[in-house]
Every structure is written in structure tokens, then in C-alpha cells.
């Protein structure tokens, strides 16, 4: 691809765009998001999408078509952001933040697929075929993105060196400016990004050199992947498909192999070259592997459908089915280009297939971030339908999945709350209430009387007085699972041979053990230690041992080291 001619005015405009992007993101995140979280969900994605498309595509700010594309991108991003905001309302902050990052990844993929079409519509000279320009644009956009990451990384490394050197002589101004001043961080990121894009777009020959390096690597990998493809497909008749169906990750592995085969072929198959860069036997190997690629997709679809039939739809399975659809279209397109040539160079049809696949993926990504293919809704509806039809039992209802599924999941949890059959199990009820109301709801139910009534006293141990129960509720989080009848067991043992028995609380629902000791001076009980409960120690085993008198203590074989009165704990596995 030839160097892009950018006028001085366009370059200054791009620099201003980068600075404005940093400034707007700073205002949205540092100032406005604290008042209303919607500023981040709506403002940041729309701002970054708008400015990124402008930086990657602009040739002249006077092009009306450019502003039409930018308006379309801005409106579409706002629409998808609105849908994300509606989904994540009421979701816990950590999950909402993860959903926003996932949305950012979707936007990045959409941008990489849409940019070649925008750039092609804005180019001044139409001296190459549509696919040839598309192929070059995808390469350049991906490598420009790589240059952006490298430029920002190197810039911040230099700034880190700068600040650390001045810290050596007691000057902390630069460290504060570079790494603790929000406006400087955002403006620097925007400026460096704009400069990196200008450099990469005006020095296309350097980008072409990097492209050739990666193409050579793909040229060496494709025969190896093709050999793997053929060897595995030859092995299948001897092992049978049943071996695949037993593995959860089978569909993912098969789709990954098919994707590698197709993407490497798309990389190596330069539309400017008339033939493949291999000798006869290797060409035959690669073409044969491409012919069997649809078989991998069909087998992956079969393995995936088995899981859907057995367990219903989930977010991952829906995405897997969409990946099957894309790879099936892609692989069958390559299959037809090899088998049904009619004297035509396969690269012509393969180019059309690649263009169609790029549009298909773009449409799917947009639909996934809209009500049409809402993966959360589909997953929750499938899960609840299986429960209501009796295919899933109450114990098979996944509260965690519902909790992480936004509005739809919360509505499903509310319906389970009124389900007497589901709520009759104390543990399920506790998990459900915790998912709906948070841990604070359970902690508020913890009281001295509730603990005294529900904690099981092991045989041979004495029921504590009110002083002990008062000590327990000082940290309600550690004992909130003990509000269920017999969920926790209390055992008395003298662990330090001082004549005063310590009390050990076994919280089996939380897999933890808490040791309490009595302070004779303050006349109070204190939590001395907390550790994880080994899987080998069950409630039944503990109660049986207490009943049979098999509870005791074992002195440690290794003693602690004392250095001039200072004690060094020696904890060795025995």
C-alpha cells in the first residue's frame, strides 16, 4: 500500500483529535462518572470509537462522506452502549465493569472489520480491486494498532525512567506529574496515539516490511497446521466420534484448528500473487487440508449440539454456535473455490468469500450487542425453561450464572424466591438471598440468640454462655453461614495445655475453621486463628470422632527458633 498523503492541516487536526480524546475521557472518567455512571457507559465508548475511526480513516477533514461514517459509528455505538447500560443496571460493580471491558473488545473487533470498508469508500484513487484493498487495509490497520501499543509502552517506560532518576535526588515532582496526575495521563495517551497513527499511515513501506515478516511466518506455519489437520481427520475413523463427545472442550479445539487453517490461508493468499508460494507436494497438502476443513466444523457443531441438548444454552455455547456458522461459511467457500474453479484462479472466489465472512462477523457482533442475539437473555431463558420442565432439578439451578446475567438473571432469581420447592433447602435459600440482597442481608440476621439456637455443640463439649456468642458476632461475615440449623459445629479442646479449653468453630458451608481463646484478664473471647477446612474432615466424621472420644491434639515435632528472645515461627509440613 502506498503512503497516505496527509496535508499539514490534516496532521494537526489528527493531533488535536488525539488530545481532545484524552481530554474528553479525562472529564468523563475523573469528573462526571462519580456523579452518574452513565457517562462512562455512554461517553467513553462513543468518544473512543469516534476518534479512532477518524484517526485511522481521515484523508481530509473536508470529506462529507467521512463525517457521515463518523455519525453512523457514533450513533451505533451509543445505541449498543444504551443496551449495555440497560442490561447491567442492578448488577454488582465488578461484573458491570467486566461487561464494559467485554463491550470494549467487541468494539475493537467491529472497528477492525468496518475500517477497511470506510477507508475504501474514502480513498481518492480506485486503482486496485476491492479485495486487494481490503486485504492491505486489514493488514495495515492491525499493524498500526501494534505500533500504537508499542509507542505508548515505550513512551511510558521513558517517563518512568525520567521520574525514577529525579527521585534519586529527592525530586518527586515528575513522578507525581507522570503517574498521579489524571489529566496528564489521559492527554499523553491521546497525543502519543495520534502521533503513532500519523507515523504509521505516512510510512506505509515500513508497515509493509513488518507485514512481509508476519506473512513469511504464516507461510511456514500453514503446511504444519495442514499436516495436523489431515493426521487428525485420518485418526478419527479409528477412534470414533464418541471419544470427542466425552470432552467439554472438544468443539473449541476443533473450531480453533479450523480457524487457524483458514486464517493462515487468508494471510498467505496475497491477492497480488498469482500462485501459492510452495512446491507441488506442499500445495497438494494445503489444498487437501482446506477440503477437509468443513468436516472439522461439522464435527464441532455435532459436539456442541450434544452439550446444548444435554444442558441447554449458555453464553459460551451461543457464541460457539455463531463461530460454527462463520467457520462453516468460510470453509465451504474455500471448498467451492478449489473444487468448482471453472478455469478461474481460486484467489478470486476466495477473496469474495473473505469479504462476505468479514461482513457476516460484523453483523453478528452488532447483533450480539443488541436485543436480537442477547446471550444473557437466551441463556437465562433456556436455564429456567429446563428447570420448570423438570429436566433440571433444584440442585442443578446455577445461582451464580443467574446472578451474573443482569436484569434477566435477577428476574429469574426473584421467581425462584417464591418457589417453595426451591427454597425448602436452607443452603439454596441462603445462596439465593445472598445473590439477591448481598452478604449484608445475611449478616444482619446474625445475632447471639440465632447462633446459640443453630450452632451444633459436639458431644463432650459444653454449651457456651452469652459472652462467647457476643464475641462471635463481632465479625458477622465469618459466622453468617451458622444461622442455618446445624451448619456449624462447636468443639472444645485445650490446644496449648494451659488448662483452659479453646473453642473451635467448624463452618462447613464455608469450609473454614475458626479457633477462639479466652482472655482471662479482659474476660472476653477472641478469634485466634482461621484456616481452611480440609476436604477429608466432614461434619459426620467430626461428630463421630467426638462421640467416640477420638478428638484430641497432637504436639508439633518442630519447635520454634528463639534468637535473643525473639521468636521465629517454624511451620513445616509433617
Swiss-Prot record:
GO CC, one annotated term: plasma membrane
Main location: membrane
Record organism: Escherichia coli (strain K12)
Keywords: Cell membrane, Membrane, Transmembrane, Transmembrane helix
InterPro entries, A to Z: DUF4153
Domain of life: Bacteria
Cell compartments where the protein resides: Cell membrane
The protein's name: Uncharacterized protein YhgE
Amino acid at each position: 500500500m502506498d503512503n497516505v498523503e496527509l496535508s499539514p492541516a490534516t496532521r494537526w487536526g489528527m493531533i488535536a483529535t488525539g488530545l481532545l480524546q484524552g481530554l474528553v475521557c479525562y472529564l468523563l472518567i475523573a469528573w462526571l462518572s462519580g456523579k452518574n455512571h452513565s457517562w462512562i457507559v455512554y461517553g467513553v465508548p462513543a468518544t473512543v470509537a469516534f476518534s479512532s475511526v477518524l484517526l485511522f480513516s481521515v484523508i481530509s477533514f473536508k470529506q462529507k462522506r467521512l463525517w457521515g461514517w463518523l455519525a453512523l459509528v457514533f450513533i451505533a455505538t451509543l445505541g449498543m452502549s444504551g443496551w449495555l447500560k440497560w442490561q447491567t443496571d442492578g448488577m454488582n460493580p465488578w461484573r458491570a465493569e467486566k461487561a464494559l471491558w467485554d463491550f470494549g473488545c467487541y468494539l475493537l473487533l467491529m472497528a477492525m472489520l468496518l475500517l477497511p470498508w470506510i477507508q475504501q469508500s474514502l480513498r481518492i484513487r480506485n486503482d486496485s480491486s476491492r479485495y486487494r484493498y481490503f486485504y492491505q487495509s486489514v493488514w495495515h490497520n492491525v499493524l498500526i494498532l501494534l505500533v500504537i501499543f508499542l509507542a505508548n509502552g515505550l513512551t511510558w517506560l521513558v517517563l518512568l525512567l525520567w521520574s525514577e532518576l529525579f527521585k534519586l535526588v529527592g525530586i518527586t515532582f515528575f513522578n507525581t506529574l507522570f503517574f498521579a496526575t489524571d489529566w496528564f495521563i489521559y492527554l499523553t495517551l491521546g497525543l502519543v496515539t495520534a502521533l503513532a497513527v500519523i507515523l504509521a499511515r505516512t510510512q506505509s513501506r515500513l508497515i509493509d516490511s513488518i507485514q512481509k515478516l508476519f506473512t513469511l511466518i504464516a507461510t511456514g506455519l500453514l503446511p504444519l497446521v495442514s499436516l495436523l489437520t489431515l493426521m487428525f481427520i485420518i485418526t478419527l475413523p479409528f477412534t470414533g466420534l464418541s471419544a470427542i463427545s466425552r470432552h467439554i472442550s472438544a468443539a473449541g479445539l476443533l473450531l480453533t484448528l479450523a480457524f487457524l487453517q483458514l486464517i493462515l490461508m487468508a494471510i498467505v493468499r496475497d491477492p497480488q500473487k498469482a500462485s501459492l508460494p510452495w512446491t507441488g507436494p506442499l500445495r497438494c497438502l494445503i489444498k487437501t487440508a482446506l477440503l477437509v476443513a468443513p468436516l472439522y466444523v461439522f464435527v464441532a457443531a455435532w459436539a456442541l449440539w450434544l452439550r446444548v441438548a444435554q444442558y441447554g444454552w449458555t453464553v459460551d455455547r451461543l457464541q460457539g454456535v455463531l463461530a460454527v456458522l462463520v467457520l462453516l461459511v468460510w470453509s465451504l467457500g474455500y471448498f467451492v473455490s478449489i473444487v468448482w474453479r471453472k478455469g478461474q484462479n481460486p484467489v478470486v472466489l476466495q477473496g469474495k468469500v473473505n469479504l462476505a465472512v468479514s461482513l457476516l462477523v460484523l453483523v453478528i457482533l452488532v447483533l450480539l450487542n443488541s436485543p436480537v442475539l442477547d446471550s444473557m437473555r437466551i441463556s437465562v431463558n433456556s436455564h429456567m425453561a429446563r428447570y420448570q420442565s423438570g429436566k433440571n432439578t433444584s440442585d442443578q439451578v446455577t445461582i451464580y450464572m443467574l446472578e451474573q446475567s443482569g436484569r434477566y438473571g435477577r428476574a429469574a432469581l426473584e421467581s425462584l424466591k417464591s418457589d417453595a420447592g426451591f427454597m425448602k433447602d436452607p443452603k439454596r435459600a441462603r445462596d439465593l438471598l445472598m445473590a439477591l440482597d448481598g452478604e449484608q442481608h445475611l449478616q444482619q440476621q446474625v445475632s447471639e440468640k440465632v447462633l446459640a439456637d443453630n450452632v451444633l455443640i459436639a458431644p463432650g463439649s459444653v454449651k457456651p454462655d452469652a459472652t462467647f456468642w457476643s464475641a462471635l458476632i463481632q465479625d458477622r461475615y465469618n459466622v453468617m453461614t451458622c444461622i442455618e440449623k446445624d451448619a456449624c459445629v462447636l468443639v472444645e479442646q485445650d490446644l496449648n495445655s494451659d488448662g483452659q479449653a479453646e473453642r473451635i468453630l467448624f463452618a462447613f458451608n464455608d469450609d473454614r475453621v475458626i479457633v477462639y481463646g479466652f482472655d482471662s484478664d479482659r474476660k472476653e473471647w477472641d478469634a485466634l486463628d482461621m484456616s481452611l477446612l480440609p476436604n477429608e474432615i466432614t461434619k459426620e466424621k467430626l461428630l463421630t470422632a467426638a462421640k467416640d472420644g477420638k478428638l484430641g491434639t497432637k504436639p508439633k515435632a518442630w519447635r520454634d527458633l528463639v534468637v535473643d528472645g525473639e521468636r521465629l515461627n517454624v511451620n513445616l509440613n509433617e
